[in-house]
Structure formats: structure tokens, C-alpha cells
Amino acid sequence: MNKKIPVFAIAALAGAISQTAMAEAPSFNYVQFDYVVSGDSEVSEGGLSESFDLEQGFGLQGGFEIGDYVMVMGRHLSLDYEDDLGFALGDTDNAVFNDMTFIGVGAHIPVADMIDLYGAVGFSRPTFIGIAGEGYGLEVGARANFEMVTASLWYNMADTDTKIGADSLDIDPELLGLDVAISFAPDAPELVLGYVDATHELEIDNDKLDLDYDHFSIGVRKSF
């Protein structure tokens, strides 16, 4: 065995560790815009289902730190789907099924030099075909910074309702997302690749409807 190989391997590992050690803690002061490039949605009720392709969509999110650990954060999703069958809006050929807005206050805690866990509670407003529920929301996640790449894994859920005549409609969304932000130069905006897998569960009286959807996005993030 060539003795130089272990030496080079150890040197490479030490270099990687030193580069990782120099990485800064992830920032929670940022704004981000996402353009949703592809996705679909499936509406299911009583064993029947209908699928819809995404026509267009965008997302906004951001955060602002107050002190060392407390933060305010928010996110918004707006998604339009092809609706040639007129499932939602009659004569129009697109439908807004599952927009979502969340604004919360929380905190982040470092668990390693480059990794923070965070959580926030606040106001959530999901929609279904123009009907908006309002209630409380919760988001938890982890964010890790590795030199030129910042990865964020997050889970958002809510318990909301609204009135339709004398009936109460519950809209309970759950979203699981992954964002990977790539920095090409110091202090420059970052390229963000994102994926979201989600569901909206709707219930009115004894009737239930499930709305499952996922999408891929590309965006721009500016951290401060």
C-alpha cells in the first residue's frame, strides 16, 4: 500500500474540517422569492380523486432576528392549477386551491457551530378555492451552513377554520419543505432550490376532502 495515500486522505479530511469550522452560523435575517417551476395537486373525497397540473406559482418568505435568539418569520405560497374541467371556478381554466400564509414569532438555538434548530408559533391563513381559514400555526425546522451552501429543512402545520353559512369548515394544512441556498460570492444574493410536499385536510360536518400537492421551485435569497 502506498503510504502517501493515508497522508493525503488525512490532509484532505483536515482541510475539509477546517473549512467547515470556518463556516458561519446560519442567518435568520433574510428575504427570499421563489418561482414554482413544476408541481401537481390531487383532490380526493370518498374514494374519488382528480389530479391537476401546476400552471404557475410563487413563494415569499423571510425572517428578522431580535437579539441573539428571538426572531419573527413568515412565508406565503400562491399556486394556480390548470382546471380545464371547471372543477373550481366554472368558466375559467385555472384554479387557486391551496394558497397559504404564515406569520410567527419564535426562536432559534445553535446545536453546533453551523447548525441551528428553530421553532415559531403564530397566525396561519390557508385557502381552498378562495375560502380562507384562520387560526394558529406552528413551524419547526433546522438550518445548517456549510461554506457556500445553506440547507433548511422545515415542517409547518396549522389548525384553522371558517364559517360557510351556519357550518364550520376546518382547513388543516401540513407542509414539509427543503431549501438549499447556494452562494457564489460573499454578500451576493443566493440561488435557492426548493421542494415542498404538503396536504390540506378539509372537513365540514361529516364530509372530508384531502388536497395533496408537491412542487419544485427556484428562487433568490438575500441574507443580511
Briefly describe each language-model feature range.
Residues 52-58, 97-103, 123-125, 132-138, ...:
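Residues that define the transmembrane beta-barrel architecture of outer-membrane proteins
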Residues 180-186, 212-224:
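Outer-membrane beta-barrel "beta-signal"
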Residues 1-28, 224:
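Cleavable N-terminal export/targeting peptides
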Residues 61, 104-106, 139-143, 177-181, ...:
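Outer-membrane beta-barrel architecture
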Residues 19-82, 101, 215:
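Short glycine/proline- and aromatic-enriched beta-strand/turn motifs that initiate or cap beta-hairpins
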Residues 29-36, 63, 73-77, 118-122, ...:
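Transmembrane beta-strands of outer-membrane beta-barrel proteins
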Residues 68-74, 112-117, 144-153, 185-193:
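Repeated loop/turn-to-beta-strand initiation elements of outer-membrane beta-barrel proteins
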Residues 38-45, 77-88, 122-130, 156-167, ...:
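Sequence/structural signature of outer-membrane beta-barrel proteins
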